[in-house]
């Protein structure tokens, strides 16, 4: 009986240690993922978190396609095996888990509706210009009065 109890206690101890190590590994993985998200948001002038099948994400990307953005990264969350974790991390910075999420110059702008409203007020281009997110090396074409 004592031998069985000793084996059971050993198995419980091993299981506990394994669970603690797994938790530490998971925490490190989540921290690494958060660091990557923060790095992307801070280093890209325009950062979009989206899902390929989401109609609002498609509409936001269509709005942004009207601008010649030179530094934009789009992360399609549904193509990741960490979709839920990424959405929870994004919630820390945007207050929401839904997509799309647009960040310009490291600041959360909003989703489709907010971006569309900003564009309709004529404020999206100035926001992108202020972020130096638009191509500026275009050669102006002279107007010959034609």
UniProtKB/Swiss-Prot annotation:
PANTHER family: GLUTAREDOXIN 2 (PTHR45694), GLUTAREDOXIN-1-RELATED (PTHR45694:SF18)
Native organism: Caenorhabditis elegans
PROSITE patterns attached to this UniProt entry: GLUTAREDOXIN_2 (PS51354)
Domain of life: Eukaryota
Pfam families: Glutaredoxin
Cellular component, GO, one term: cytoplasm
Residues the entry annotates as binding [2Fe-2S] cluster: 54
UniProt-recorded name of the protein: Uncharacterized monothiol glutaredoxin F10D7.3
Molecular function as annotated in GO: 2 iron, 2 sulfur cluster binding; glutathione disulfide oxidoreductase activity; metal ion binding
Glutaredoxin domain ranges (all copies): 34-135
Family: Belongs to the glutaredoxin family. Monothiol subfamily.
Biological process, per Gene Ontology: cellular response to oxidative stress
Organism classification: Eukaryota, Metazoa, Ecdysozoa, Nematoda, Chromadorea
Keywords: 2Fe-2S, Iron, Iron-sulfur, Metal-binding
